[in-house]
């Protein structure tokens, strides 16, 4: 499936990219792409971010096994805290 990936904050700076289209069937394959294309440090950072598919957190779905469809958007967003 052709997936649109959006990188934000420190991850975008690290990979020197904010958007790309890749082939992936689930979120785990997106993470594998990040490791192969950008290295272990990028993968480690990506796993600490909020990962959303079409605006919905993967925590509400099947986490890294969340199935993707053609045209889906996977975004890596910084987790913000407040008080």
Language-model features, listed with the residues they occupy:
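Ubiquitin-like/PB1-type beta-grasp interaction modules and other compact soluble beta-rich domains
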Residues: 1-82
């Amino acid at each position: 499936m052709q997936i649109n990936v959006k990188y934000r904050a420190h991850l975008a700076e690290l990979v020197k990219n904010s958007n790309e289209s890749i082939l992936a069937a689930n979120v785990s394959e997106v993470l594998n792409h990040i490791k192969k294309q950008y290295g272990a440090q990028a993968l480690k950072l990506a796993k600490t971010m909020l990962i959303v598919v079409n605006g919905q957190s993967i925590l509400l779905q099947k986490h890294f096994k969340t199935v993707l469809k053609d045209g889906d958007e996977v975004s890596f967003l910084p987790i913000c805290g407040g008080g």
